[in-house]
Structure formats: structure tokens, C-alpha cells
Amino acid sequence: REKLGDAFLSPYTIIRARLAFGGFDFIVEPYSVFFENTLPPVLAAFDGAVAALKAVTSTDETHAEPMILYLQQYRSALAEDRVDKLEEAWSLCDRRWMDTKAGIQIVHDIEDGYSDPLRAKQGPDFSLRFLDETFDTQNSQIQDIHSLICKYYKSRKTSLSADGLTALSNTIAGIYYIPFKTGCSLVFSYSGQSIPNRLDVKKDKGVKIYFDAVETMARVEQVKSKVLDIFADARSSVIDKFQPDAVDQLVWHVAAHEVGHAIYGIRSISQFIQ
């Protein structure tokens, strides 16, 4: 446990308040301390998953080895009880995660800002994502868009575009099916998500972009309902005429938007913002 102070802004800690001297005493605790009664079966599940992956056949070794290293580091980061070691542990977890390229993806505690209005704390999170073969054609179109954007920024030959080209060229993107999620993913679900957020990891390893067709379809229905509430004759003049399609929006609007984050994220151009 750490006194409130330098550890306050550590993203992978939780602040506990307890009564003391007629007031409150605030303590900063890593996940492993705050969730000490919850984590043991979780850590055991990680050990089981690693053991199972080590037993896979040789034909799967290309994807198994990076996943083993990732899960081992993920477990290590969850179990870390020293506040001053948390950033190093989770940064390495991001890097190990970026090395996993299989169609089955696990996503850890990686988004900041969505679960904490102060944008200080990392929301505990976990989700399982499958590259959705239902959308093979659309995923191929997303890859074509990505290739065109890479070609454009390579042609610019500016220092700003050059700084982001490693991340952009290493980007993988696609429409994923997400059968299981927990933690802050239950509070807010993404139509499109571009991660990791650490700029050094992004520059070295690239970016992963996940598109969720189910969530995008839900957003389209919400917009339709709002349009009908606001505009007269909206169904015949707008909705029936244009027939908004969620998957088309993912491919031709959200994909380009999220891929663009890989090269021109706000964190990349902060020195140019006055």
C-alpha cells in the first residue's frame, strides 16, 4: 500500500478511503492488493491457459508462442504489488500483446479515460474477440483502404508523417465478433477502437483496430430513432431514401477514421497544438 501522492496518478491502482482520526485516510493500492480475494482464480486460469498453449501442435506454434509470452506478462502485471513497477509491467504487456497476430484476440486493461472522468485510472477490463469471417469481403476492403492511406502518407515525405508511418504500416484492422467481455467494456462498447495508447509502443509495434458490427448496428438504430423524433417526414425523405447500413459505415467511414489515428493521434502532434 502507498500513501496518496506520487502514486495517485498511477493508472493501474485503486484509491481506497477508510475512516481515520475523525476523517478519511486515502490509500493507493495496485489491482493485486485491492482485489486480493478475487484474483487468485483469475491468475490460476492464466496458468492453465499458458499450459494448454504450450501443448499445442507444431502447426500452431506461429501464433502460440506470442500468445504464451503475452499471457505470461499479462498475469505478471495483474499480480504486481509494487506501485513503482506497474508502469513497466503493463507497458511490456502492451508490447507482448502487439506481437499476437492470430484471428482470436484477447484485449487487456488498455483504455484510459473512458471509465474515469479524470482520465487518470485504467479501468479493469478483459474481452475475447474473433476476426469475423462473416465479413471477409468487408475486411478485405478495409485492408485496401489501409494500403491506400499508407501509400498517401509515404508520398508526403514530411517528418510528421514519417514519425507515424511505422505505426500505420504495422496496423492490423478488421471487423470482429466479441462473444465475451467484462470490466469497463460493459460500461462502454466501441464501434471502432484503435489501441494501444502508449505512443512509444505504437511507434515501435504499430496499432490494432477492432470494429464491432453489432455495436455499430445498435448505434444506427439509435440515430434512426432520433432522426424520426426531430425531423418531419424523416422516414421517406431520409431513412428509406438513404437506407443507412452499419457495416458500410464501418468500412467506408469508421475504418478510415480509426486507421488515421495510427498516424495522427493527438498524442503524436501535441507539440504542434498551441
Spans of features found by a protein language model:
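Contiguous, non-catalytic segments that form substrate-binding/exosite surfaces or channel walls
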Residues: 59-238, 246
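Hydrophobic transmembrane signal anchors and adjacent membrane-proximal interface regions, especially
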Residues: 14-17, 26-28, 33, 128, ...
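Post-HEXXH active-site segment of zinc metalloproteases
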Residues: 265-273
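Alpha-helix capping and helix-loop boundary segments enriched in small/acidic/polar residues
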Residues: 238-250, 273
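Noncatalytic N-terminal accessory/assembly modules of large enzymes
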Residues: 1-81
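Generic detector of intrinsically disordered, low-complexity, polar/charged segments
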Residues: 19-20, 100, 257
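Active-site recognition of the HExxH zinc-binding catalytic motif
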Residues: 249-266
